[in-house]
């Protein structure tokens, strides 16, 4: 009996692998395969758990019957996935009809096999119980878990105009966030140890700031899926204190600024200041919390400026959703006027396409573009004599520079746009996905559009082709109208 049981286990494993690879071949995406296979695996675990709770022995007949239920669960998962994909691909709502068919299929199986519960033989009763419990588990899992996972990772983001999650993207995100958390833990442990070291706090703060810079540089360096471009025409060395201002697009902005120098302190908002991971670190090195007002920190800022530190501020106050620069607040310019410091503008591009504010746990491909503009001396009155005038004029100056960068980088060769284009089609079937991939490659990423299509106008896309020209126009030339 033991040998036969082992053989059935072997058959179960082989059949599971065959089903998995058959689904993978059919869907063409490992993500859809896992979504279809997971309900079968969960229902199998539920069946085994219920058998253990109810004291039903796992004999030869039960193995065969459980495998039969496993196969039915496979069919149910495929039908549910077909309904979900149809709605995602074409908008047709066929899922409810699939659910109805699944319900009646499960109902007839339960009624047919459930009749054996009235049998007097214990083996027949166990067969009946396993059939009833197994089918209920399979139907509930197929009705709930699979649609929830599909909506969370694919349909939900797409309905908000965001790209769906991919397995590669999730792995990339987990690894980089894990690296970030390891760096935070290391710094927190180091700070705890430094409290015991009899050295001036300013010296310990310099060490921690240096390690923060190294950590930020390391994380950006290990983000291999992201291109980095650093422009520093003025050859800025951060040797003299300044008020550093930059447009705010993403969490990456903080890493970029802190990687430039170990002599940069930041003005932070509530969630950064109270973060359970790095809040204690930034408080130790004397970052500043905007919620408590600048006046409270003015003397500490003067002291830090004398030690050679610059102060970095995002004048917009919050991250942008669409990459467009918002209105500048005058706090940074008030500080520059009060502390008599130069203003150092820095333009950031592409960070919101890598980690979007609306989708913070999905790191995508793209470009981290950093351009350090020339310093604006404290006694330079060309931008106005007062902080209010300087706010408006420097804001216009930076927006003009940012618009120039957008014209230069918003092209079909931008890896962020290419990935966004492909991700519009990846879960709509292997034929559609590979047609689009090959089509885009044959068209050389539609580079011709960079010369032909104006910045503003109305574009008519004639022909079917799946619509990639319209998608790439929408991404690269947002001011054009598509029909």
Where do the model's predicted regions map?
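Membrane-embedded transmembrane helical bundles of large multi-pass transporters/channels
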Residues: 1-169
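A transmembrane-helix-recognition feature enriched in membrane-embedded lipid enzymes
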Residues: 166-227, 280-281, 428-437
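Conserved SAM-binding loop of SAM-dependent methyltransferases across substrates and taxa
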Residues: 466-478
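Short beta-strand element of Class I
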Residues: 480-482
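Catalytic core of membrane glycerolipid acyltransferases/transacylases, capturing the structured
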Residues: 191-210, 238-293
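Non-catalytic C-terminal accessory region of glycerolipid acyltransferases
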Residues: 171, 295-427
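Conserved alpha-helix/loop element of class I SAM-dependent methyltransferases that forms part
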Residues: 439-456
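Conserved class I S-adenosyl-L-methionine
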Residues: 457-465
């Amino acid at each position: 009996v033991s040998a036969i049981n082992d053989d059935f286990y072997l058959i179960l494993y082989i059949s599971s692998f065959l089903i998995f690879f058959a689904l993978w071949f059919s869907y063409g995406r490992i993500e859809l395969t896992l979504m279809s296979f997971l309900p079968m695996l969960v229902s199998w675990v539920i069946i085994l758990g219920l058998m253990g709770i109810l004291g039903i022995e796992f004999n030869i007949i039960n193995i065969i019957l459980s495998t039969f239920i496993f196969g039915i669960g496979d069919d149910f998962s495929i039908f549910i996935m077909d309904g979900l994909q149809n709605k995602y691909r074409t908008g047709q709502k066929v899922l409810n009809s699939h659910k109805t068919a699944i319900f009646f299929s499960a109902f007839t199986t339960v009624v047919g096999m459930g009749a054996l519960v009235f049998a007097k033989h214990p083996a027949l009763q166990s067969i009946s119980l396993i059939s009833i419990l197994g089918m209920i588990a399979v139907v509930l899992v197929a009705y709930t878990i699979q649609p929830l996972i599909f909506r969370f990772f694919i349909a939900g983001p797409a309905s908000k105009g965001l790209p769906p999650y991919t397995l590669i993207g999730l792995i990339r995100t987990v690894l980089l966030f894990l690296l970030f958390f390891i760096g935070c833990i290391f710094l927190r442990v180091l700070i705890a140890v430094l409290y015991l070291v009899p050295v001036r706090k300013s010296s310990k703060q310099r060490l921690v700031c240096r390690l923060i810079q190294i950590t930020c540089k390391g994380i950006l360096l290990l983000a291999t899926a992201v291109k980095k471009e650093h422009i520093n025409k003025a050859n800025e060395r951060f040797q003299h204190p300044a008020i550093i201002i930059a447009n705010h697009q993403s969490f990456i902005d903080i890493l970029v600024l802190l990687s430039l120098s170990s002599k940069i302190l930041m003005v932070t908002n509530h969630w950064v200041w109270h973060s359970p991971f790095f809040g204690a670190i930034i408080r130790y090195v004397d970052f500043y919390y905007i919620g408590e007002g600048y006046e409270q920190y003015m003397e500490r800022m003067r002291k830090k400026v004398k030690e050679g530190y610059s102060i970095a501020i995002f004048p917009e106050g919050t991250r942008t959703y669409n990459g467009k620069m918002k209105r500048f607040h005058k706090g940074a310019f008030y500080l520059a006027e009060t502390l008599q410091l130069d203003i150092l503008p820095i333009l950031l591009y592409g960070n919101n396409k890598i980690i979007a504010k609306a989708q913070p746990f999905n790191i995508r491909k793209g470009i981290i573009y950093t351009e350090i503009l020339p310093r604006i001396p404290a006694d330079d009155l060309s931008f106005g004599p007062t902080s209010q005038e300087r706010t408006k004029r420097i804001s216009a100056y930076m927006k003009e520079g940012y618009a120039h960068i957008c014209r230069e980088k918003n092209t079909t060769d931008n890896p962020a746009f290419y990935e966004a284009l492909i991700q519009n089609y990846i879960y709509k079937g292997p034929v559609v996905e590979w047609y689009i991939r090959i089509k885009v490659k044959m068209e050389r990423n539609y580079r011709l559009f960079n010369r032909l299509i104006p910045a503003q106008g109305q574009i008519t896309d004639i022909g079917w082709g799946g619509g990639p020209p319209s998608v790439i126009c929408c991404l690269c030339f947002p001011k054009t109208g598509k029909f």
